[in-house]
């Protein structure tokens, strides 16, 4: 399998960092997946989404989650996020402690060039 960078220099990551009600962790994940995999998720319809998001659970604190994805345009992400928050209001949000589901954004300033990853992959063979 070829090595690929997690994200590309010049793009952005959205990083949601939040806690879920400890009594509803499984419910949260189920509802998140139902919304995320549905045709009703406008994030997946945007050409500004470069790589689809991943939902990660903290191994030390099972109530803590991160949602991370790569986008080329953070204004476009913020515009769609506002639609989610104000119009669609997905059911999984009710299990987030404090109800805050707003990301921080990070600019990707370094990403290993593909030719170096290809060389590293060849060396593993």
Question: Model-found features: residue ranges?
Answer:
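Active-site-flanking beta-strand signature of metal-NTP-handling nucleotidyl enzymes
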Residues: 11-19, 66
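An amphipathic, aromatic/His-enriched active-site/gating alpha helix that lines ligand/cofactor pockets
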Residues: 34-51, 60, 70-106
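Short amphipathic
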Residues: 17, 107-108
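A short, glycine/Asx- and small/polar-enriched loop/turn
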Residues: 61-65
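Eukaryotic N-terminal low-complexity, Ser/Thr- and Lys/Arg-rich leader segments
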Residues: 1-12, 108, 112-125
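Short coil/turn motifs at secondary-structure junctions
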Residues: 21-23, 72-74, 110
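Short, surface-exposed ligand-recognition loops at beta-strand->loop->(often short) alpha-helix junctions
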Residues: 19-32
